[in-house]
Amino acid sequence: MPADGIRARFRVDYAGFALDVDLTLPGHGVTALFGHSGSGKTTLLRCVAGLERAAEARLEINGELWQDSAAGVFLPTHRRALGYVFQEASLFPHLSVRRNLEYGMKRVDAASRQVSWERVLELLGIGHLLERLPGRLSGGERQRVGIARALLTSPRLLLMDEPLAALDLKRKNEILPYLERLHDELDIPMLFVSHLPDEVARLADHVVLLDQGRVTAQGSLQDIMARLDLPTAFHEDAGVVIESVVAEHDDHYHLTRLAFPGGAVLVARRPEAPGQRLRLRVHARDVSLANSRIEDSSITNVLPATVREVVEADTPAHVLVRLEAEGTPLIARITRRSCDQLGIAPGRRMWAQIKAVALLG
């Protein structure tokens, strides 16, 4: 295994459930552990944290051995350089935000600190909250403080167990940009547990799919989201993720052109400067197909693409079509009738009409 990777082998047996995984993961970026409730996501995270004693285990983090059952090596949780963020921030209610954060810093001597106090406050936007008690914080503010406390331990690995699950939509949207900043600006690998495709699409670089304690698939976010043989393809939010670059702005029509391998799309004017990267989400339900380009249409974003795969959808009336536009994958959810009428089959050249594009971040 390369020194900058994460190797995790765990076997845990409970009555009625067993976790059995053997993973080699990137030692950087965000790896999402994705699956339905009871699939083993949290159990795997607890194993990594040393909170579960697996019958068989080996854990290596960027070249540092934390656990090896065969060799009798077990680093206890308090000696593992990790931060753990739970669904609800476990803050000391009688201590101010400042003192809660200072508690996290006490775990690390000054010489070993990799993330400064000032940097954490700025990244998470909590400087104005320092003198408040936890009871006077909103749900989103509490989670940001909990994440800050984890970061102030200068972790080599950050574990996040559905940190947005307890938040309503407004608070979730409030905290997501801060999580994106952590992803973009800190060189700390993260394991992020979620059961929501849109959360994974927004934050992850790598995805591990779990089901009944087993790994069913893993790979880059783009590859996993484009596969039709996985449960993600049949979710109502199914679709692909595209990494794009701001190409230019059209000040007359107040539009921005976002370019990627295989084409470009126009979206409402963005504030980002040309050259800045943006992640796009194109849902399968927002892609229609045509055998020829329709010029007199209000649909602006149309790409030439080749059909790679056609499979049955979750209803007998629909099919899922995977296409490729010069290396960029797309998925379309269309009726079986349209599929037959258009003669859609692997290898066929078509025009993919994108009715909507979601900007992630």
From Swiss-Prot:
Q: Name one Pfam family in it.
A: TOBE
* Location relative to the cell: Cell inner membrane
How is this protein situated with respect to the membrane? Peripheral membrane protein
What does the record give as the reaction this protein catalyses? molybdate(out) + ATP + H2O = molybdate(in) + ADP + phosphate + H(+)
Could you tell me which residue ranges the Mop domain spans?
296-361
Q: What is its main location?
A: membrane
| Domain of life assignment | Bacteria
Q: Where is the ABC transporter domain?
A: 1-237
Q: What is its EC number?
A: 7.3.2.5
This entry's Gene Ontology molecular function terms read: ABC-type molybdate transporter activity; ATP binding; ATP hydrolysis activity
Name one cellular component (GO) term.
Answer: plasma membrane
Q: Which Gene3D superfamilies match?
A: 2.40.50.100, P-loop containing nucleotide triphosphate hydrolases
For ATP, which residues are the binding ones? G35, H36, S37, G38, S39, G40, K41, T42
Output the NCBIfam families linked to this UniProt entry. Answer: modC_ABC
Please give the subunit comment from the record.
The complex is composed of two ATP-binding proteins (ModC), two transmembrane proteins (ModB) and a solute-binding protein (ModA).
What is the name listed in the Swiss-Prot or TrEMBL entry for this protein? Molybdenum import ATP-binding protein ModC 1
Q: Which organism is it from?
A: Azotobacter vinelandii
